[in-house]
Amino acid sequence: MKDTVKNLEALRQAMRKSHVDAVIIPGTDPHQSEYTSAHWKLRDWVTGFTGSNGTAVVTLTDAGLWTDSRYFLQAEQELEGTGVTMYKEDGGNDPTTTEWLAENLEEGGVLAVNGLLFSVVQASRLEAFCGENGFRFATDFDPFPEIYADRQALPLDKVF
């Protein structure tokens, strides 16, 4: 929990430096795999949530984690005391990530992602969402080389 609070603050400092108001951090790698090498567990590092499914959204003042029903209990336990709120992806009255952003990001705000971690379709949808809501969309935000000092290197193992 202590590291999560520290990691969230490091991310927020990088956001301020880059003039980013919100960032989406998926739990996937550039191949859209839910089961990633340690190098790509960026959402885990920021939120403390270690389940294989989940998306984090962080603003300068709030943070949320969206996950499916397989991980509701785990997420509640791992997020306790971190300042990250759990939202249910499938069921209940919780907002979607974009509904939450529409309520928590001011017009003209910058929503940023690391474009390597999103498919063209996902990025296009986010770009359209931003346009409809008066937000700016950036796909080149990757603060982790600077803020995640002990991040594991990319694996060099053969795929097959």
Positions of PLM-derived features:
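N-terminal accessory/capping or targeting/presequence segment of soluble
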Residues: 1-107, 114, 118-160
